[in-house]
Amino acid sequence: MFYKRFELKILKNIRVLDFGRYIAGPYCGALLGDLGAEVIRIERLSGSEDRFIHPLKDEGGEGAMFMQMNRNKKGMTLNPTKEGSATIVEKLIKSADVVIAN
C-alpha cells in the first residue's frame, strides 16, 4: 500500500524574512515554512552564530540544530556595512508579509 505525504500549504502565498538568531527566531521561520510560507533566511557573510553549533562531521560543517531550524527556507548572506545593503534590505522588507527578528 502506498501513502501519499500530506502537505499543509495554508501559508503558500506568504513571504517571510527571517533575521532571527539562535533558536527562537529560526524555529518560528521553520514552522511558517512547514505551513507553506516562502521563508528567506538572511545571514551575515560569515554565517549566523547558530550555523556551527554541534557540527555533523567536521569542524567546518553545519550543525544539526542549524539544519533543523532552517528547513524549508531559502537563504542569502548580506554585508550590512557595504554600500547598497540597506537598499536591498528595504526592498526585501517591502515585499514581505512577515519579518522575524529577535
PLM regions and their residue ranges:
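N-terminal helix-loop segment corresponding to the beta1-alpha1 unit
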Residues: 2-102
